[in-house]
C-alpha cells in the first residue's frame, strides 16, 4: 500500500502534468491559411470537392409522397 504522503505527491504531480498539458495546448500556433472561415468547415487538402446539398423538408415530402391536408 502507498502511504498517504506518497499518494499525495503522486496526485500533485498528476495535477501539474495536467496543467502543463492544457497550457501547452493553448499555445499552439496556427498558420494564417488555417484561420480563414473556410478552414472551419473543411480541410485545405480536400480542395473544391462538390458536396451534396442537404434536402429540405419539402424535398423529402415530395420524395416520399407526403401531401399537406
UniProtKB/Swiss-Prot annotation:
Q: Where in the cell is it found?
A: Secreted
What does the protein in this record do? Probable FMRFamide-like neuropeptides. Plays a role in behaviors associated with a sleep-like state induced by stress (SIS), acting in concert with the FMRFamide related peptide flp-13 and neuropeptide-like protein nlp-8.
- Give a yes or no for keyword Manganese in this entry: no
| One of the protein's GO biological processes | neuropeptide signaling pathway
Transmembrane stretches, start-end: none
Q: Which family does it belong to?
A: Belongs to the FARP (FMRFamide related peptide) family.
List Phenylalanine amide occurrences by residue.
Answer: 64
Which of UniProt's keywords are assigned here? Amidation, Cleavage on pair of basic residues, Neuropeptide, Secreted, Signal
Propeptide stretches in the record: 26-51, 68-69
Q: Which GO terms describe its cellular component?
A: extracellular region
Protein name (record) = FMRFamide-like neuropeptides 24
Q: Does the keyword Signal apply?
A: yes
Amino acid at each position: 500500500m502507498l502511504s498517504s504522503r506518497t499518494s499525495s505527491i503522486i496526485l500533485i504531480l498528476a495535477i501539474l502534468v495536467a496543467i502543463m498539458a492544457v497550457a501547452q495546448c493553448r499555445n499552439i500556433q496556427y498558420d494564417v491559411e488555417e484561420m480563414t472561415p473556410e478552414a472551419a468547415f473543411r480541410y485545405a487538402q480536400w480542395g473544391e470537392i462538390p458536396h451534396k446539398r442537404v434536402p429540405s423538408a419539402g424535398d423529402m415530402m415530395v420524395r416520399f409522397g407526403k401531401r399537406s391536408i
